[in-house]
UniProtKB/Swiss-Prot annotation:
Entry protein name: Guanylate-binding protein 1
Positions of the UniProt region annotated as GTPase domain (Globular): 1-309
Modified residues (Phosphothreonine): 587
Role summary: Interferon (IFN)-inducible GTPase that plays important roles in innate immunity against a diverse range of bacterial, viral and protozoan pathogens. Hydrolyzes GTP to GMP in two consecutive cleavage reactions: GTP is first hydrolyzed to GDP and then to GMP in a processive manner. Following infection, recruited to the pathogen-containing vacuoles or vacuole-escaped bacteria and promotes both inflammasome assembly and autophagy. Acts as a positive regulator of inflammasome assembly by facilitating the detection of inflammasome ligands from pathogens.
Domain GB1/RHD3-type G: 35-276
Organism: Mus musculus
Catalysed reactions, semicolon-separated: GTP + H2O = GDP + phosphate + H(+); GDP + H2O = GMP + phosphate + H(+)
Compartment annotation: Cytoplasmic vesicle membrane; Golgi apparatus membrane; Cell membrane; Cytoplasm, Cytosol
Oligomer and partners: Homodimer; homodimerization occurs upon GTP-binding and is required for the second hydrolysis step from GDP to GMP. Undergoes conformational changes and oligomerization upon GTP-binding and hydrolysis. Heterodimer with other family members, including GBP2, GBP3, GBP4 and GBP5. Dimerization regulates subcellular location to membranous structures. Interacts with SQSTM1. Interacts (when phosphorylated) with 14-3-3 protein sigma (SFN); leading to GBP1 retention in the cytosol and inactivation.
UniProt-listed GO biological process terms: activation of innate immune response; adhesion of symbiont to host; cellular response to interferon-beta; cellular response to lipopolysaccharide; cellular response to type II interferon; cytolysis in another organism; defense response to bacterium; defense response to Gram-positive bacterium
Repeat is among the record's keywords: no
Source species taxonomy: Eukaryota, Metazoa, Chordata, Craniata, Vertebrata
Gene that encodes the chain: Gbp1
């Protein structure tokens, strides 16, 4: 299920019961399993306008989304159908069918507004389905588009301006597709044939004037032009007679109106070819889990009496994914270290070199799976955890070395200790005989490979544990004069002091190596962070340029149509977008 989802039928994603929006947890589980990028196509429109038929066609099925055959609206809430994309391998097509707007049985305009807003927020292609032509009645029925700024926030800051809203809406909002059912007019304008797209643009033309009627006429048209600069229109003839309409999903295509069948084929082909993957600000690609998070965040805001905020949704998603990215990076680091390290290592440098390689790759894993890490909070957490893991490996390495050396010493010196117990060395000349045997075994110990970092430390500790025995043998050896015993004791003290100094120097060296490695770690974090932020900056600048380009096209249209004031207003918006501060540069961790 991880790569492809095979839903045999649609499932309710957001239930609309008793004027409350409730998320279906089973639908969320399905979204969680979709690791592929998702192309989200949502359709809205008045009830009983045939939305579900088009969505079934996109799913490649005759039935699925409920069509119904009466004046009652069948679809309640938002229904979801996830299918493999028929034309783009590696992508999943998520179809969202919504309940009919302005259902007389429901009588709740506010819920219609939220359904409309959610469809816009969740989709990469937004289809508005209506019956007949684009006249003033059709525009009045599309009043929801004029309320989008009252239903959706693009930024979380309370002082956000309409210009900021408009710019961010263009960056977030989907392609707008208007499907006109049972269309019976000839597509002509001023006596010349026009395309459905040209018909849409003609219908969105503004009227000059400042009276209330003109403002009312222009408002929905301005909103569509402003928020949806990428627009498409499809017209559909009536599919058949009234009897056929009541059982449309069961009728063979060759029994339907030929023009209607061709128009549906053209529509589905466009959606499959040109509907893009759902993305968020900064070019963030949405997959199943990310879509799930958006659904939860938006519905939670609505149910709490707040406006769904696009920025907050992205930041919430970033919190979830960045936390998971830290864990993914740490898991990768541990797996690589455990696979490649052979403990105990002979030197600390050997372990630190491996740590540095695995750490660099772990940071790459984090960078690949994270985004919008505000103030590098999660990268700092990753750095702290990697340092702790490094220290744990250093300790484990030393512990394993200590245990191995302890076992080796016990094995090598076992016979010598047995001889001591038997009194072999309690005789004249016994001390130097003991010392000779001890030095032979010490040499064997030193020559034995694979002891690790604690080799000298453990040898010193072992000898320290036997100091009383050596001291006793020295004092009891009657072949030695007091002067010779004194000289030997001084030698032993000097050796002990030298060993202590070596141990101290080794500790200092270890500390310096760890500090140097910490600096290298910091530099690696900064290097990858700088590269990622530069890439994100380029993506944001490209997105800003795309928004400006779309607005410039709209400004040019307004200018050509003689709307100087509206064109000037849009020009001012464009200049404000251009003067927006660039994404902030990298900060020190």
């Amino acid at each position: 299920m991880a790569s492809e989802i095979h839903m045999s039928e649609p499932m309710c994603l957001i239930e609309n019961t008793e004027a409350q929006l409730v998320i279906n947890q089973e639908a969320l589980r399905i979204l969680s399993a979709i690791t592929q990028p998702v192309v989200v196509v949502a359709i809205v429109g008045l009830y009983r306008t045939g939305k579900s038929y088009l969505m079934n066609k996109l799913a490649g099925k005759r039935t699925g989304f409920s069509l119904g055959s009466t004046v009652q609206s069948h679809t309640k809430g938002i229904w979801m159908w996830c299918v493999p994309h028929p034309k783009k391998a590696g992508q999943t097509l998520v179809l969202l069918d919504t309940e009919g707007l302005e259902d007389v049985e429901k009588g709740d305009n506010q819920n219609d507004c939220w359904i409309f807003a959610l469809a816009v927020l969740l989709s990469s292609t937004f289809i508005y389905n209506s019956i007949g032509t684009i006249n003033q009645q059709a525009m009045d029925q599309l009043h929801y588009v004029t309320e989008l700024t009252d239903l959706i926030k693009s930024k979380s800051s309370p002082d956000q301006s309409d210009v900021d809203n408009s710019a961010n809406f263009v960056g977030f909002f989907p392609i707008f597709v208007w499907t006109l059912r049972d269309f019976s007019l000839d597509l002509e304008f001023d006596g010349e044939s026009i395309t459905p797209d040209e018909y849409l643009e003609t219908s969105l033309a503004l009227r000059k004037g400042t009276d209330e009627n003109t403002k009312k006429f222009n408002m929905p048209r301005l909103c569509i032009r402003k928020f949806f600069p990428k627009r498409k229109c499809f017209i559909f003839d009536r599919p058949g007679d009234r009897k056929q309409l009541s059982k449309l999903e069961w009728i063979q295509e060759d029994q339907l109106n030929k023009e209607f069948v061709e128009q549906v084929a053209e529509f589905t082909s466009y959606i499959f070819s040109y509907s893009g993957v759902k993305t968020l600000s900064g070019g963030i690609t949405v997959n199943g889990p990310r879509l799930k998070s958006l659904v939860q965040t938006y519905v939670s805001a609505i149910c709490s009496g707040e406006l769904p905020c696009m920025e907050n949704a992205v930041l919430t998603l970033a919190q979830i994914e960045n936390s998971a990215a830290v864990q993914k990076a740490i898991t990768y680091y541990e797996e690589q270290m455990n696979q490649k390290i052979h403990m105990p290592t002979e030197t600390l440098q050997e372990l630190l070199d491996l740590h540095r390689t695995c750490e660099r790759e772990a940071i790459e894993v984090f960078m690949k799976n994270s985004f919008k890490d505000v103030d590098q909070k999660f990268q700092e957490e990753l750095g702290a955890q990697l340092e702790a893991k490094r220290d744990a490996f250093v300790k484990k390495n030393m512990d394993m070395s200590s245990a191995h050396c302890s076992d080796l010493l016990e094995g090598l010196f076992a016979h010598l200790e047995e001889e001591v117990k038997q009194g072999t060395f309690y005789k004249p000349g016994g001390y130097y005989l003991f010392l000779q045997r001890k030095q032979e075994l010490e040499k064997k110990y030193i020559q034995t490979p694979g002891k690790g970092l604690q080799a000298e430390v453990m040898l010193r500790k072992y000898f320290e544990s036997k100091e009383d025995l050596a001291d006793t043998l020295l004092k009891m050896d009657q072949s030695l004069t007091e002067k010779e015993k004194q000289i030997e004791m001084e030698r032993i003290k000097a050796e002990a002091a030298e060993a202590a100094n070596r141990a101290l120097a080794e500790m200092q060296k270890k500390h310096e190596m760890l500090m140097e490695q910490k600096e290298q770690s910091y530099q690696e974090h900064m290097k990858q962070l700088t590269e990622k932020m530069e890439q994100e900056r380029k993506e944001l600048m490209a997105e800003q340029q795309r928004i400006i380009s779309l607005k410039l096209q709209e400004q040019e249209r307004l200018l050509k149509q003689g709307f100087q004031n509206e064109s000037l207003q849009l020009r001012q918006e464009i200049e404000k977008i251009k003067n927006m501060p660039p994404p902030r540069s990298c900060t020190i961790l």
